[in-house]
């Protein structure tokens, strides 16, 4: 089945609107709302988003959906122009990287991890998803597993929080983990689908302490 940009964008708008309502009402999502939230796929490949606020015309088939998107973004910003620009820029920045892992691949990875733990009589106490999206890998653990997730995109993080209320969610880049008040600083399993792209993320700690690791190899017996 070919990718339908309009259908994907409309699904994203519904998911964002639902997440906003859940956040404002301080409650958990209903079963129907969870279904809506799970359809969020980000704006990867929806290049029309990049045309918002520019002179580049948006195709007629996408104009109405883009208008609805802007209305939702305005509601999310609550009249704060600075926040509105941040949300919009965050959305635009995701166009080149926000591509979600197919469910069957996540299930295959999850089953392999679970089988490994079961075969070795191990318990998964902590789990980290460092580039979570809407948390595709979070079900890897069991009911007793403490989950932590990082997602730097503002709107995606909002959906993630609504979809996984029992997960400690940080709407920040994973490189900020040392400055966050995580409940755990060691994890039994770390799994995620890291965004592809030739982009460098500034990590001050890495720059100062780990840069030499990228400049050569050492062979230790």
List where the protein language model places each region.
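Class I S-adenosyl-L-methionine
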Residues: 2-163, 167-168
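SAM-dependent methyltransferase catalytic-core segment centered on the flexible catalytic loop
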Residues: 128-221
């Amino acid at each position: 089945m070919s990718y339908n940009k309009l259908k994907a964008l409309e699904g994203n708008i519904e998911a964002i609107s639902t997440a906003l309502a859940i956040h404002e009402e301080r409650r958990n999502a209903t079963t129907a709302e969870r279904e809506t939230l799970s359809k969020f796929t980000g704006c990867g490949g929806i290049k029309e988003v990049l045309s918002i606020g520019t002179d580049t015309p948006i195709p007629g088939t996408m104009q109405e959906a883009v208008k609805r998107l802007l209305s939702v973004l305005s509601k999310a910003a609550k009249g704060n122009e600075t926040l509105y620009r941040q949300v919009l820029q965050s959305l635009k920045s995701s166009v080149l990287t926000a591509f979600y892992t197919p469910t069957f691949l996540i299930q295959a990875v999850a089953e392999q991890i679970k089988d490994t733990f079961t075969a070795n009589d191990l318990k998964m106490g902590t789990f980290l998803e460092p580039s979570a999206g809407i948390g595709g890998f979070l079900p890897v653990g069991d009911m007793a597993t403490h989950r932590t997730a990082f997602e730097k995109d503002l709107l995606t993080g909002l959906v993630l929080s609504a979809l996984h209320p029992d997960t400690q969610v940080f709407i920040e880049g994973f490189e900020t983990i040392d400055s966050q008040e995580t409940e755990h600083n060691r994890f039994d399993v770390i799994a995620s689908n890291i965004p592809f792209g030739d982009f460098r993320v500034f990590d001050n700690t890495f720059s100062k302490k780990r840069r030499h690791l990228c400049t050569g190899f050492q062979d230790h017996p």
